[in-house]
Structure formats: structure tokens, C-alpha cells
Amino acid sequence: MLDVHKDIKKIFHEEQVLAEAAARYGFSKDQVRFLADAENYVYECMKDNQPYILKITHTIRRSSDYMMGEMEWLRHLAIGGISVAKPLPSLNGKDVEAVPDGNGGSFLLRVYEKAPGQKVDESDWNETLFYELGRYTGSMHSLTKSYKLSNPAFKRQEWDEEEQLKLRKYVPEDQIKVFQQADSLMNELRRLPKSQDNYGLVHADLHHGNFNWDHGKITAFDFDDIGYNWFVNDISILLYNVLWYPVVPYDDKAAFTEEFMTHFMKGYWEENELDPAWLMIIPDFLRLRHMLIYGLLHQMFDLNTIGEEEKEMLAGFRRDIENGTPITAFDFSALV
């Protein structure tokens, strides 16, 4: 999880910005509860006795137009019948409100409905959930095929424009083998075909911290990372996330991969057609995600002050990347 940018922390005057947010969205300043400061400052606020989620970031990190790309896609999904945490417009009818910081930049505010239900727990971690996740992801991919940008300025990034994949910017320059492996894999992936049936705007960070489970129904939130990608990479990212930190620990990674993917794809194929041959590329996309997380960890950590545990974790990632180690030993041809 990314920490709020240190340059943003320096200029964030919480009380001022929250007062402005309350005025622009019409909620009570006294009923604002701090939740988190990861990629955004996140608060819960009340309006008409309904809870909403307020997210605050800064133009250092995102432009207002870039966020409009998220808001517009969310509305497209909601109109198509997918349960998402929808944006709430401000009293001025805006999806993104800008509060000047006095230094030429702005704090950007947006408010969302609070997703019904709860985070999944151990009792929910079973084939029903995996199947419903498949249906949910398949529905998003099916709907994204009909999405049209209303304004080219709102366009989200392509898969290879991801900041954390710029490994040379964050990883020590002597890790030549890491860069070679990343370049080689990304060049290979760039040759994959792209069409409306396999590539489009996707969530790109689905995991059990980003949706609520309400009596068998999923509502996703946190669409901060949406971008253009192959549908199979969106599936791979979710798989990487459930392998990385499962709600219920597994003994055998390959066996769990088989269990998860079997039920997930059953649900997925009910909602979206995707040529099964694409599943054979999942191991490559899992390795790509491993590289992205390696970049993210270097972006987060100060290598001069990290402890032994973090050093060991980075060393493990480096070994995996340099040796091209598969993330899971499962043979994906079993699903095809």
C-alpha cells in the first residue's frame, strides 16, 4: 500500500480542507471520521443520515481530468447494473472538487456511496465467493467493451505506463539482471494482440480489501488504479493478490490456485466470453505483477533505514525476478 506522498503531507491542513469539503458536499463537519491515509486521505462522512466516503488527494499525484476518467467509468458500470460504490456529485454538480492549496496546486475531493456489507472473513472464503468474484469480474469486462470516453483528457493510463513498472527509477542501478528480465517480459507482452474482446479499461487492483460482501453480493470500491489492460491481466492481478495474502492460509499454493481459478472461471465465463487460450499467459502476468510490487516496495522503502525483514523480502523478490521463478507451480492448461 502506498503511503500518502510526503510532499502532500507537508501542505495538508486537515481542518481547512475538511471544512471546505463539508461546505461543498453538504455534510456536517462534526460527523467526519478519519479512516486511512494510504494513497489518499480517506474519511467517512454523514449526509441525510447516510454514510459516504470522502477521498482527498492532491494535484501532485493526480489531475482532476484523470480522476474524471474513474468517475465516468464507475457511472458506466453502475448504469450497466454492476454494484459499485457510486460517486456523489457536490452541491455544484461536480464529481471532482478542487480546493486551492495557496501554492498553485489543489487538493482534489471526491465522495462515494459507502459500499453495503462487510469485508470478507474466514467463513466467506470458499468456492461461492470465488465463483461470485468470477461473475463480477466477467460482468465488468463485458460492460467495459461498450465504454466510450466522453473526453480524451479523461483517458486512463495504458498497462505499461504504470509508475511502479519504471524499475530503473526506483531500484538500485546495479540490479542489471532485474532490468533485463523486466524489459524482456514487457517486450514480449507488448506483442500480444489487443481487441475489444480481450483488452479495455479494467479495475487493475481487485482484492478482498477493495470490495464488500453483503449476503452473497459483491460491491467493489477503490477504483483508483483503473487503466487499460488485457482482461487476463486483470484476472492475474486478482489471483496474485489472493495468493499473496489469502483470508484463509493455504498449505499448497498450486492446489489453492486450481481451486480458486476453477470456481472463478466458472463464474467469469457465465458473464463474459474470453478465449481460454489467454489463461496460458497468466504465469507471465503474475511475474509482471511481482515486478510491479518490487518497484512499489522500492518506492515506499528507504533502503538505508529498513530492517532485516524488509531486506529479506526484497532479496526474495530479486531472486524470483532474476531467475524467472513462476509465482505458482499450477499448470494453467488444466483450465483450458
Curated annotation (Swiss-Prot):
Gene3D superfamilies for this protein:
1.20.1270.170, 3.30.200.70, Transferase(Phosphotransferase) domain 1 (1.10.510.10)
Q: What does the protein in this record do?
A: Phosphorylates the antibiotic amicoumacin A (Ami), leading to its inactivation. Mediates natural B.subtilis resistance to the drug.
- An individual GO BP term: response to antibiotic
Which EC numbers does the record give? 2.7.1.230
List the protein's name: Amicoumacin kinase
Similarity field: Belongs to the pseudomonas-type ThrB family.
Q: What terms describe the molecular function in GO for this protein? A: homoserine kinase activity
Source species: Bacillus subtilis (strain 168)
Task: Give the InterPro entries listed for this entry.
Answer: Aminoglycoside_PTrfase, Kinase-like_dom_sf, Pseudomonas-type_ThrB
